Amino acid sequence: MPRTPAEPSSRSGAWASVQRTALSKVLVMGVAGVFGLINTRIIIGHFGTDAYAQNGLLATFPSLMPFTDLGIGAVILNTVAGSEDLPRDAVVRRTLTTAVRVLLISSLVIATTGVVLGLLGAWPTLLGEDLMDGGGTTATVCLLVYAAALPLSVGQRVIVGMGRSATQVISTGVVSPALTCMLLAAVVARLDAGNAVPVMSYLANTLVSLICIVVAWRATRPLLADAMRDVPRLRAVRGVRIIDTAGPQLVQSLVIPIAFQTDRLLLSHLGEDGSLAQYNLAAQLFNLLTQTVAVTGVAMWPHFAKARARGRIESPFAASTAFAGLGGALGLLL
């Protein structure tokens, strides 16, 4: 297929998606910021600073393990974005079937690892002195919840691949209010739930995957239903080759947490008393900046994937300049 320059309407559509995503993220951050302060006050006031520090420590599991999807997210995004008839696309269907199979294996490994570490009593050694009494069991339960929700994450990838990143971002707005409701329920019931706080946080985050899988299911009907039906049919429905796309994404996922997400573990092992709790407070502001730039960048992914599938040439320099300016402006504001 001959390559053609990018179409103006395509570029304007991509930037409109970025704008919607950025505005949605700002709105969600505002809501999350308010409820985040409420949650912090409830946790520290009713469950203590130790519970707050442990919650921040265990909350880093997903950041430390972004490789758990084994690069599948990139495969789904590219395939969905390049489809011309998404509900009936056989390639997308087989890709989703393969993705769910791989994620189920990853979930089983994560769950098994959590249980084994819990039975061996190895969590205090791995996570440091900021782990509360009984925190090992809490860490295991958090991993089990995370593992159970992992296959559902295909819904988020499908939505983003469809160019509806704003929908995925808005769905994350339920996390902080849901956690507030669970914390208030524990307070009203007078439960000594310090160790349960991280589990509540993981359950609240699972709501995002549930919402997105429902939205994706309805928007692509009957695609997801057919793909899920094929998951156990290993011999009748063969998978597709995904290593070419998933491999490079997996390498990035392995490197990034080592560079940026090991800070809390170091503080837990080497920091002074209270340093981890103080760091968690400061990290909330920094995460607002990085998350905004990240989600707006992901919003551009379907645009470039679709252009590549159609043989169009798209320059990334304008987007890179815009994101650099956005990051600098947000940094100055914070």
Regions found by a protein language model. Name each.
Residues M1-T4, T97-L127, V141, A185-A189, ...:
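Alpha-helical transmembrane segments of multi-pass membrane transport and lipid-handling proteins
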Residues A147-T172, L191, K306:
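Membrane-interface junctions at transmembrane-helix termini in multi-pass inner-membrane proteins
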Residues P2-V18, N195-S201, I213-F260, G311-R312:
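Interhelical loop/hinge segments that connect adjacent transmembrane helices in multipass membrane
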Residues T49-Q54, L86-T97, A111-L143, A189-V199:
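Membrane-interface helix-capping segments at transmembrane helix termini in multi-pass transporters
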Residues G136, T140, I170-L224:
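Hydrophobic alpha-helical transmembrane segments
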Residues S17-A81, A111, V145, T180, ...:
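Signature of the first transmembrane helix
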Residues L70-L86, G161, A225, A282, ...:
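Helix-loop junctions and terminal segments of transmembrane helices
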Residues N55-L70, I256, Y279-V298, G327-G331:
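Transmembrane helix-bundle signature of multi-pass secondary active exporters and lipid flippases
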